[in-house]
Amino acid sequence: MSDTARTGTSDPAADSRSNYDYKSDDVERPGLMADLDALVEGEVRFDTYTRNLYATDASAYQQLPIGVVAPDSTADVTAVMEYCADHEIPVLPRGGGTSLAGQAVNEAVVLDFKKRMDAVLDVDPEGATVRAQPGITLARLNNNLKPYGLKYAPDPAWGDKSVLGGCIGNNTTGAHSLKYEKADGYIEEVEVVLADGTVTTFGWMDAEELHDRAAAVGPDDPLEDQIYAAVSRILREKDAEIEERYPDLTRNVSGYNLDKLREDIEERGEVNVGRLLAGSEGTLAIVTEAEVSLEPIPAETAVVLLTYDEILDAMRDVAPILEHDPSAVEVMDDVLLDLARDTAEFSDLVGTLPEGTNSALLVEFYAETVAEGQRKVADLLADRLPGYDPETGLDASEGAPTTDDDPYAVDALEAYDDEQQSRFWKMRKAGLPILLSRTGDDKHWPFVEDTA
């Protein structure tokens, strides 16, 4: 039975199942595992050990799932969704489990894409796009792209564990959000499974085509058509409200991604419903394949670690540093530096910092040559480091950015070779694992992240 037949309306959000009072006893029945096992080619695990493994993710939350399915294909996902829709059983797509707000745990049938749906399907170097399954880690995806001189730009700290599907679901960005967009800006096309098990593809279409298609949708048309109709109606009727209520932030991922669709219509006269899935955390549809656009790998990078006596000094320096057009600016506070000092892997590096260092800013620049990278660092230090005396012999460039703000940095460590830059970045990206590994009763438990 279609959603419109249940409710008598063309609005998918009015599905009567949204009022279903879910209780675990309603779905924990002997035949559930056997039914799913007969429907899919992948793994179906409902044993206590597996359920306990999937009851946690990188967050502080814990919730025992109903069971776990590792799908082998889009057909498997379709079978699970059709069955669970008919039996009113919640379904939760799971990627790498790296999110810190509990997105990957719930009392549901968990679909684990990382185990079996993790392939690169096609690379188009000329078009700078790649098509891949949702379970591939970002690190492995970029390793596959490196020979082409291309990369998938969103780079969360746990890129060796974060997967493409989760990146889209979370609308991830990363340390290089100064240069690159969030995941939504790279979605070209997605193959998805809808709530009723329908498989469809969302990609670019002319905005007028969307509205014309929506106008022809009737109350008994399939769910896919109802979605187009609902998106069209919301974009038309709520245009002014979307503009007014959505914050003008480069890293806003709260709420459904209606502002991105509105922005695309304004800028290019086109709309991509697939971009609405970015940040939806699997609540709108389940991605089974994604075609995403790519960025060129920079020819060279230069990194400098600016040290400060106080965290507030580092914070005051951020705005002037941004005037120099860095590719990344990342902070390391006294807690992280103190713990890193007691970590064998980073103790030597932290030991080279000036005595009394309370915090540091890792600043990175992209460049075409090593010399250009050195010049950009010299320009920054001439502006932000009092009494800077360049060991490289480089003076600040004529016309280089200078600010009226007082400089606060105490010292600087420069890095132009891959090995030293990697050490700086590894210490920054190891921040959360270092915090979680501290001994004693005092522990860091992340549960609210990236607020402003």
Protein language model regions, located:
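Noncatalytic alpha-helical scaffold of FAD-dependent oxidoreductases
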Residues: M1-A452
